[in-house]
Amino acid sequence: MKLIIIEGGDRVGKDTLVKNLQEYFVDKDVSLMIKHWGFPQGKTNEEKTAYQKEQFRNEFVRFNTLRDVKEMVVIWNRSHIGEMVYGPLYRGSDPKSWVISLEEEFRFDKDPEIYLIYLKADPEFLAVNDDGRSFSNKIVDKQQELRFFREAYESSKIMKKLMIKVNKQNEYIESTRILDEVIQFVTQS
């Protein structure tokens, strides 16, 4: 089984990449499962953090039960990696230790069929293209978010990681080019 984790801030093309991967794999002889992580539930920051911890653990357990299914591709749109960004930024939590512990406990650090794809863009580009649903459209906030994503990406114990910049100046790079790069990475590495 392959697990492809798509991460990055808002407006970097995660949903587009997931849709394109789905279309790519539909013609292959594999089962496909897609999980999209949403906002944490809870009234307080502590409840939201506890919710995230429980949900990620449950999904890791579920993933582990499917691990031996050879002809399966699982795609996570957002993941535990994002918790190392948004937990500190918006809930005042410090999830790095438990997030990395999950990766180690469930052998994400030893599995060559787990792929982390980090989509990034310039902070100015993200601020200009913000759709109003992000936490902030200020460049300084985007810079901090990108810095946290970079740190989370580098801290992750996942063996196979790919970072893709999705913009060139003021334009998105063609989604087919990004898809081709990801397909090459997950099928030939």
For every predicted segment, state its role.
Residues 69-74, 113-115:
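Loop/turn-to-beta-strand initiation segments
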Residues 71-84:
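Conserved P-loop NTPase "ATPase switch" module shared by AAA+ and STAND
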Residues 36-51, 83-95, 135-137:
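Surface-exposed cleft-lining segments at the edges of enzyme active sites
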Residues 12, 16-72:
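Conserved substrate/cofactor phosphate-moiety recognition/catalytic segment
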Residues 86, 90-154:
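A glycine- and Lys/Arg-enriched "phosphate-lid" helix/loop adjacent to the NTP-binding pocket
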